[in-house]
Every structure is written in structure tokens, then in C-alpha cells.
């Protein structure tokens, strides 16, 4: 269920069991804060230019070093991980990342970016020629936990789990809350009307299979890191379309 903007000024959602999800940062990358019984789970960290906004948003919602259980990186592209080191230093937040991208985080290396449509394939080719993609590295940070195919969150105080949803990158993950709302990173986009297909993906076919995994969770709302929310019906139509290709 989507909630109107409250005193925090942030868009938020609430599941049937009362778990709240706040969009604590938007713009270059949507970052979400899951709230349950005064405990918080941050999903993605945004870019360093957004650090002040992220920090203010966390403070406004009452997230502290004692209540912020972890930072979950849906993957280690710079626009999701650039503030990871700052969050660890400021909030002592443990960082959770998929095991296939742990070295990327430790080295501050941006995983390979690949276009999934003709225009972005050309764009990446041109950027590679000029070596500009090498400028997308970020401050390294140590992870506290490596996630495999699934990590249950109940033991950490949250009704849900982390699910490996590869395709955009090898280590892309989604956070499933109450089998109702999924925080999906870049596994799907919400920019173009009626579409969820990301313009960048290392393995588009594998990504489409990850859509099936997301549909199987029973979630009805999908919150991407780029763009606006998408519902189950849109995702199902897109899965049916691209699964036939």
C-alpha cells in the first residue's frame, strides 16, 4: 500500500503487517529505508553528491548507528555504492553484498557496465574507447556479509528476505518485504511507461529469468532504483514479452 507523503516529506509504502518503506533518496538513484519496530535496513547508498541529502533523510527518520541494522547493496555500480564507505564510517553500518561482487566493493571497482539496447551498447562502446568508465570507481569499503542465493531477514527483525536476481550484474539482489513489496535495484527500471526493461544489463536473458523469480515471490509492488514503482501486472506483461525472444 502506498502512503501519502507525511511529515518526513518522503514517499513511503506500508505492508499489511505494518512494515514501512521510505524512499529516503531519489534522483540519480532511489534509495529505500525499511523500518520495522524502530530498526532500519537501508537499501543502496546513492552517489557522493547526494550524501548530505541521504544523511539528512536518515537523521529525520531516526536511523542511528544503533538502529541501522545494515546497508544492503543491490549491486556494486557506483551510483548504488558510492556512499557505502561513508555510511560505514558514520553509522557503523555493516554492508551486505552478493558474494560475486564482494571484491568489487572492497576494491571500489565499478562492475562492468553493458548496454542492453542498441543506443546504450553504442554509448558504452564510445565510453570504453575514451576510458571514461574507469572514472566511475569509488571509495572501497569492507563488507560484513556475503549473500548467496537467499538470506532470510527474520532473524534481523524484518519480515522478508534477500533474493539473488542476477542479470543486470552477476551479483544483483532484491529485497523482498512481507511477500508484498520488492526493492529491486536495477533488475527492472521504472522510467518508461509500461516498460521495466533496463537500458543496461550484462545478461538480459538471465535478467528476464530473474523477473520470473520476482513474480514468484507474490509481491504486488516493485520499487526500482531508477524511476517509479511498477505493479505486478506490468512486470508480468513484460516477462511474457521478453521471455519469448
State where each predicted segment sits.
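Soluble, non-transmembrane catalytic domains of enzymes that act on hydrophobic metabolites at membranes
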Residues: 33, 66-90, 102, 148-149, ...
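Metallo-beta-lactamase
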Residues: 48-49, 135-136, 159-234, 238-241
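Residue-level marker for buried hydrophobic side chains located in beta-strands
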Residues: 41-43, 72, 95, 183, ...
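Short, conserved active-site entrance elements at the starts or edges of catalytic domains
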Residues: 6-10, 133-158
Amino acid at each position: 500500500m502506498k502512503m501519502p507523503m507525511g511529515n518526513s516529506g518522503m514517499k513511503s509504502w506500508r505492508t499489511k503487517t505494518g512494515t514501512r518503506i521510505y524512499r529516503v533518496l531519489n534522483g540519480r538513484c532511489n534509495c529505500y529505508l525499511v523500518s520495522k519496530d524502530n530498526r532500519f535496513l537501508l537499501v543502496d547508498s546513492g552517489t557522493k553528491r547526494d550524501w548530505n541529502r541521504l544523511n539528512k533523510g536518515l537523521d529525520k527518520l531516526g536511523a542511528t548507528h544503533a538502529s541501522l541494522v545494515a546497508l544492503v547493496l543491490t549491486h556494486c555500480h557506483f551510483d548504488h555504492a558510492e556512499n557505502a564507505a561513508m555510511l560505514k564510517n558514520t553509522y557503523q553500518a555493516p554492508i551486505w553484498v552478493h558474494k560475486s561482487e564482494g571484491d568489487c566493493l572492497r576494491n571500489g571497482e565499478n562492475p562492468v557496465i553493458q548496454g542492453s539496447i542498441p543506443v546504450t551498447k553504442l554509448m558504452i562502446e564510445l565510453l570504453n574507447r575514451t576510458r571514461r568508465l574507469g572514472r566511475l570507481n569509488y571509495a572501497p569499503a569492507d563488507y560484513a556479509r556475503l549473500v548467496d542465493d537467499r538470506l532470510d531477514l527474520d532473524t534481523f527483525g524484518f519480515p522478508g528476505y534477500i533474493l539473488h536476481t542476477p542479470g543486470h550484474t552477476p551479483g544483483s539482489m532484491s529485497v523482498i518485504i512481507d511477500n508484498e513489496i520488492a526493492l529491486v535495484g536495477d533488475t527492472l527500471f521504472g522510467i518508461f511507461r509500461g516498460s521495466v526493461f533496463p537500458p543496461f544489463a550484462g545478461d538480459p536473458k538471465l535478467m528476464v529469468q530473474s523477473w520470473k523469480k520476482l513474480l514468484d515471490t507474490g509481491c504486488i509492488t516493485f520499487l526500482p532504483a531508477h524511476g517509479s514503482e511498477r505493479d505486478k501486472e506490468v512486470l508480468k506483461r513484460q516477462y511474457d514479452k521478453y521471455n519469448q525472444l
